[in-house]
């Protein structure tokens, strides 16, 4: 609880608080959803995550909540060693949505509780990294430049896909 109070104090002093979780690790007890198909159905964790986010939001002047980032099935630097079409085939948007259902449900509930709050925004990285069918872990198939440093952290190139939205929120 002490760390929440520290976050709260820092958030009160900041123009903008950006909050991002490793939802897969917290809700599923696993670093990457590709490594475990079994979800932890722990309702208390979901409730606690919702309460923590709302607590930090209530301390913040303005807040951006970053949704779950699609996990890459491979460590970013190794992407050049695999067949790109195989990687793309194993990373559907449907798979991402299924594995992140709990986190997306929590974010949806938070969004519903804040729909009239102009100082609260949600950025869903999958909207920038996925099309209607699949999520991309490379810039394009002709230029296999990875969008990730590892399995869950975006590289500079990957981050550029969402940082413009964050910058526009800073300017509002």
Regions found by a protein language model. Give the residues of each.
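Extracellular glycan-modifying ectodomains
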Residues: 1-172
């Amino acid at each position: 609880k002490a760390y929440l109070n520290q976050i709260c104090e820092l958030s009160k002093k900041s123009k903008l608080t950006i909050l991002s979780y490793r939802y897969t690790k917290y809700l599923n007890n696993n670093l990457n959803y590709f490594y475990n198909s079994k979800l932890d159905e722990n309702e208390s964790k979901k409730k606690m995550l919702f309460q923590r986010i709302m607590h930090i939001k209530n301390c913040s002047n303005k807040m951006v909540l970053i949704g779950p980032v699609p996990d890459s099935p491979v460590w970013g630097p190794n992407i050049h060693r695999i067949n790109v079409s195989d990687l793309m085939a194993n990373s559907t948007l449907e798979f991402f949505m299924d594995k992140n259902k709990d986190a997306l449900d929590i974010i949806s509930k938070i969004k519903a509780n804040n729909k009239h709050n102009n100082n609260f925004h949600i950025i869903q990285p999958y909207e920038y990294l996925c099309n209607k069918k699949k999520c991309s872990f490379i810039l394009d198939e002709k230029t296999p430049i990875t969008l990730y440093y590892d399995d869950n952290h975006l590289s500079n190139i990957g981050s550029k896909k969402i940082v413009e939205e964050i910058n526009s929120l800073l300017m509002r």
